[in-house]
Amino acid sequence: LPAIEAALKTKPIDGRITLSGYEGSELLVARLLIESGADVRYVGTACPKTAWSAADVEWLESKGAKVQFRASLEQDLAAFEEFKPDLAIGTTPVVQKVKETGTPSLYFTNLISARPLMGPAGAGSLGDVINAAMKSKDRFDEMRDFFEGVGEGHAAGVWEDVPKDERTFRMKEKRKRITAEQ
């Protein structure tokens, strides 16, 4: 374990993180992040609470992390809103929502849990991935500003031409439906 501890110290993580997933390794990853210096405020997992997770939960909570078992998407997103992390690690819908705000985010399954985390090389490489993502905040802001409004509201969906905002048409159709229902 001293070799893993040394590897974690060579690439410290300085930032607030929320983490959520459904794989079962969320508590382990959160511990590695905290041991690397990260401020992990929330750990959500789809897995149930078991006797085997008790020691990890106790340790994580002693470090200020809220652990949510059988976490829902709504709970994961609420944690993001509450803790305003520098980086959110999560499932596809979490990452999608977080990126819309211009906050860096990583897919837990593809970029974190798929990594070999045991041993000095695996645990030590976690810092590279996390730090690189947190440094991309400016790029996320540029992308958010560039794409703002695209695919939202009247422009949502697939279009052959430039979408037109047909609010008056929709209002007329809504009135027709309401009248027909009465």
Task: Put a short name on every predicted segment.
Residues L1-Q182:
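An N-terminal assembly and electron-transfer interface module characteristic of large anaerobic redox
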